[in-house]
Amino acid sequence: MAVESRHASEPAVLDAAWLRELCLEHGADDVGFVSIDDPSMVDERPYALEVMPGTKTLIGMVRRTNRDNIRSRARSVGNAEIFNTGHDIDETNDAIVKELDALGIRAANPSTAFPMELPRYGAPRVWGLQHKTVAVAAGLGHMGIHRNVIHPRFGNFIILSTVLTEARVDEYSKPIDYNPCLGCNLCVAVCPVGAIKVDAEFDFLACYQHNYRQHMSGFREWVQRIAESDDGDDYPNHFGEAQTAAMYQNLASKPIDYLSGYCLSVCPAGEDVIGPFLHDRKQHVREIVKPLQQREEVIYVSEGSSAEAHLRKRFPHKRPSYVTNTPRLDFDLVETSPAPPAPEDAA
């Protein structure tokens, strides 16, 4: 491992094998390295430099999740798994940064998920780095049809994270030369709002309105409903008891409540995952896919939308609930706006 002084004019150049072992020792299940000058990082560069000026290398990592927790029909189990694994990999990142810092090497670890830069709410990105983009460039997998990264071994049962460092690495990673996605389209079949399509673009709005209901969009509507209520007795006419309880839970415990995520649950890709699917596809569908399709639940959609039409046609036993204030906000989220200025360009 080559290490230079913190005050040297040129940053350290680290041995890739040493850095990889460091990350694995602290809990990462796989790791790859990307230069900030890599063409694939052109959109991430300003966000990386906003987090830490002088960034030279992005360290992409994955941590495995428990597959059966993610597959559970009890969404509280899947949500707890996502939160707990995210917490674990944040601790991994922190330990790596501290060890590099002890060696005189600057490093920073943006959060895996929350907290985000929510004062930017309404801009296209309230998070810092796009961990998916880094992971693909770092050789940790490719995006499947469901827009999640599929690791060649662990499948989509992973949480992604990124560490930034001023050091360069003597050997950078490359994207893998194949996509682990099987094209089985089980994610298409299980999505209650029809957001995932074989022959069309991903419907961001449909996914966001339902899956992220307990996040900012639902919270904003909840506040509006409180303001519109005449008094406590009138409040249940505007926001149901079950909705209130769900909002309370998301605020009081872990800000990670997703209402669906079924696309992750049913995905059979990945060397460690695919065996049972290849052995008996019908059993995979019967035990994992069908229970999620048959689950009776409320699905949040815009009235008259393609998501509502899909829901009523494919899942008539699931009940639509109309969202009233999110379309404007959601479209704002996907509009383009300037990225944060690079430090050298900032006034």
Positions of predicted regions on the chain:
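Non-catalytic, usually N-terminal nucleic-acid engagement modules in DNA/RNA processing proteins
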Residues: 1-87, 91
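Polar/charged alpha-helical tracts
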Residues: 17, 21, 25, 102, ...
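Catalytic cores of enzyme domains
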Residues: 42, 84-271, 275-288
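Short alpha-helix boundary/capping motifs
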Residues: 51-52, 128, 219, 291, ...
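Compact disulfide-stabilized, cysteine-rich extracellular microdomains and processed peptide cores
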Residues: 123, 280-281, 285-292, 297, ...
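Long, internal scaffold/assembly segments composed of regular secondary structure
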Residues: 252-255, 270, 279-280, 294-304, ...
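Short, C-terminally biased terminal segments at protein or domain edges
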Residues: 286-288, 292, 301-310
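Long, compositionally biased charged/polar accessory segments in the mid-to-C-terminal portions
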Residues: 303-343
